[in-house]
UniProtKB/Swiss-Prot annotation:
GO CC, alphabetical: host cell cytoplasm; host cytoskeleton
Record has Cytoplasm as a keyword: no
Region feature Zinc-binding domain, mapped onto this chain: 40-78
Summary of subunit composition and partner proteins: Interacts (via C-terminus) with host IRF3; this interaction leads to IRF3 degradation. Interacts with host IRF7; this interaction leads to IRF7 degradation. Interacts with host CUL1 and CUL3.
Domain of life, per lineage: Viruses
GO molecular function: metal ion binding; RNA binding
Protein name (record): Non-structural protein 1
Length: 394
């Protein structure tokens, strides 16, 4: 059984490129070239995976063979990093487990050690991109990313940083999915600030883009938004990346995107009862993403994810269509009144009543207080995120 630090190096082995050495059992050695055939669930890297002695699944690379299997619950690391559920866990449950994982990791990973401080120096002034097929980078593994897959009728959740964008399902694991705990920008160790280097957190990859209004195909760069911890005031700075261009996200521009995306959510909610075969603009192939730019879609998921989730849940409760109605049932009066309520709350703080969309006698009228309070809280979170964070070009 490896000791704590050696086990940490097995699990959090990070490499920048093929010319630099990788961390392996307290020593530095060069990366051996081999053909990758899967994702190692220990170092979360694209490797040549081998069968595990404990469970028989091919989920370990050659450098992680001595690490304990994720199914071995007796291991101290596994009890914090790997979580098993019988049913689909909620975001709040995942967040509680993630806090315990973060606290445990910081108690074991000491940046005062020379070997671990060397990892930070190698990461100095480098940005972490999700496109790891071209460039590999070091990153502190305390992020809001998690890996989820189903195996033997159980759901496994693993926290950590992923060094590849080519995660694919394989036969033994049934299904594999990369997710994010909300869109939180996670805490960093205080020792990072002392190095006076610029460190990037996990890049955000939106999965809701299906096409864009351009002749060129969608690339991975269209999904990125970079975040960096500023050493002067310890605040986060953001810049959206579209192609090769970095677009500054100022407070005024962020507020513009917020109002624009509120209208987008209202548009989709207003057409939620329209049948898929009707002549509704929501189902028009030319408006599949509502002519939204990549930056708008990334902004929705990065800064107002709670508002988007509220509209998604509210649509599921109220947006059932009828098969015998093949016409567009969009009601401009109701949506205009709903939009006016939201705008008044944003501008003057007037409480949202939801009386336009949930009239007296509606099936959801008994839960109207919960719905209106949750919407106002979601808007407050988005506005506080816009106001409190300094957003600029990295």
């Amino acid at each position: 059984m490896a000791n704590s630090f050696r086990e940490m190096l097995y699990w959090y082995r990070k490499i920048i490129d093929r010319k630099l050495p990788c961390v392996n059992v307290n020593i530095w050695r060069r990366e051996i070239a081999y053909k990758a055939n899967g994702i190692c669930l220990n170092c979360l890297n694209e490797c040549k995976v081998c069968p595990c002695d404990y469970c028989g699944i091919r989920h370990k690379c050659e450098n992680c063979l001595n690490s304990d299997c994720f199914m071995n619950t007796n291991n101290e690391f596994n009890s914090h990093r790997w979580i098993t559920f019988d049913e689909e866990p909620s975001q709040m449950v995942l967040f509680e487990y993630w806090i315990m994982y973060k606290d445990y990791f910081l108690s074991k990973f000491n940046y005062n050690y020379k070997a671990q401080l060397k990892i930070l120096n190698m990461n100095k002034n480098r940005r972490f991109h999700i496109n790891e097929s071209k460039k590999k980078a070091l990153s502190v593994p305390i992020t809001s990313q998690y890996l989820k897959f189903k195996f033997n009728n159980k759901i496994y959740i693993m926290f950590g940083t992923f060094l590849t964008s080519k995660i694919q399902p394989w036969i033994q694991l049934k299904s594999l999915k990369v997710g994010y705990i909300q869109s939180l920008n996670v805490d960093r160790c205080a020792k990072l600030i002392a190095t006076k280097g610029m460190f990037a957190t996990n890049s955000f990859k939106s999965s809701c883009i299906t096409e864009i209004n351009a002749r060129r195909p969608i690339s991975e760069c269209d999904y990125l938004i970079e975040a960096c911890l500023c050493n002067e005031n310890n605040e986060w700075k953001f810049s959206a990346v579209m192609g090769r261009d970095k677009i500054p996200v100022t407070k005024s521009l962020a507020m513009k995107y917020f109002c624009k995306n509120i209208n987008t959510e209202l548009f989709y909610y207003g057409h939620s009862k329209c049948h898929v075969v009707s002549e509704c603009p929501r189902w028009n192939q030319q408006l599949r993403v509502l002519n939204a730019s990549t930056l708008n879609i990334i902004f929705r998921r990065q800064f107002m994810n709670e508002v988007v989730e509220w509209f998604e849940n509210f649509t599921q409760l109220t947006g059932m269509h009828y098969d015998f109605i093949k016409t567009c049932v969009y009601n401009k009066v109701i949506i205009s009144h709903f939009r006016k309520e939201i705008e008044d709350y944003i501008n003057s703080g007037k409480k949202i009543s939801l009386s336009s969309v949930i009239p007296d006698g509606h099936a959801l009228y008994t839960n109207i207080d919960i719905l209106r309070i949750s919407l106002m809280l979601a808007i407050d979170v988005a506005l506080n995120r816009i106001e409190s964070q300094q957003m600029d070009v990295l």
